[in-house]
């Protein structure tokens, strides 16, 4: 009987090791490099993820291929900012793991990175969270979608989805969280990952992360004719865009671009612009920020 249990135990262990090896994960469930002797398989780096070996035909992987996350590394390299290795923490899966590990002759940096924001940025085989997430859903996206990532440089707003959603960090405006902060316990995934059929490849939601505003009505939250988000959102966007143009005109004409009034007005403008362009994660806060910037016009002339 002991021999039977020993055999079963060894079989389970070998199966687990095989699973992690195939998927590109080590025994602690984090992304790991291919063996150094296999570097020839990838002339650029041994750090590539291998999730597509098993998941390439699944809807989640196919959706991700067309999502912004799959272009994160290319966007970084070809973007307008000076690229630093630390930028990889949000633009390339594996940086947080490999930056602390030494592989002879293979440093994880902007020249050797090949992964975009791929599977291991959000998932781990050893996680006890729902969907094997590395963190609870409400805490995951804000790791990168925030102002203080440092990629763009000190004082430059790179992106501001988190701060806009929570309604904070702007100049001259009291804290104003979006009503969705309380209503949506899982935060971002409610809008950006909602999809009707998990077994089909979607154009919105899922791993496309493209918000489908029709769900605002079908969820029962905005189901009245006067409160239809598919109709109202373009109106909100046009209003915010008009204010942004007015603020930009004032900023461009300001003679002193070092004054506190200028810095405050520009911060608010950059926050709204950094929130996917139009502050749609918190429309009342976006309007309040721009209104305050417009109120500084006389001080900026």
What does each model-found stretch correspond to?
Residues 5, 20-301:
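Short sequence/structural segments immediately N-terminal
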């Amino acid at each position: 009987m002991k021999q039977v249990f020993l055999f079963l135990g060894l079989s389970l262990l070998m199966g687990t090791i095989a699973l992690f090896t195939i998927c590109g994960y080590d025994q602690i469930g984090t992304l790991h490099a291919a063996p150094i002797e296999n570097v020839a398989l990838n002339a650029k780096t041994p750090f590539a993820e291998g999730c597509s070996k098993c998941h390439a035909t699944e809807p989640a992987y196919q959706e991700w291929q067309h999502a912004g996350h799959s272009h994160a590394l290319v966007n970084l390299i070809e973007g307008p900012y000076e690229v630093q290795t630390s930028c990889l923490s949000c633009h390339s899966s594996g940086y947080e793991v490999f930056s602390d590990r030494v592989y002879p002759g293979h440093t994880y940096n902007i020249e050797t990175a090949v992964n975009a924001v791929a599977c291991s940025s959000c998932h781990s085989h050893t996680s006890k969270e729902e969907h094997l997430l590395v963190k609870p859903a409400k805490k995951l996206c804000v790791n990168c979608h925030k102002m203080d990532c440092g990629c763009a440089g000190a004082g430059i707003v790179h992106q501001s989805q988190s701060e806009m959603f929570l309604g904070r960090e702007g100049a001259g405006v009291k804290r104003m969280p979006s009503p969705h902060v309380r209503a949506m316990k899982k935060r971002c995934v409610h809008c950006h990952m909602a999809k009707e059929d998990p077994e089909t490849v979607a154009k919105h939601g899922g791993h496309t992360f493209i918000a489908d505003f029709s769900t605002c009505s079908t969820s029962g939250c905005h189901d009245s004719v006067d409160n239809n988000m598919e109709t109202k959102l373009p109106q909100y966007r046009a209003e915010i865009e008009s204010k942004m143009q007015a603020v930009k005109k004032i900023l461009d004409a300001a003679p002193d671009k070092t004054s506190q009034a200028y810095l405050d007005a520009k911060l608010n403008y950059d926050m709204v612009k950094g929130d996917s362009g139009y502050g749609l994660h918190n429309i009342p806060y976006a309007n309040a920020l721009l209104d305050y910037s417009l109120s500084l016009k006389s001080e900026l002339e």
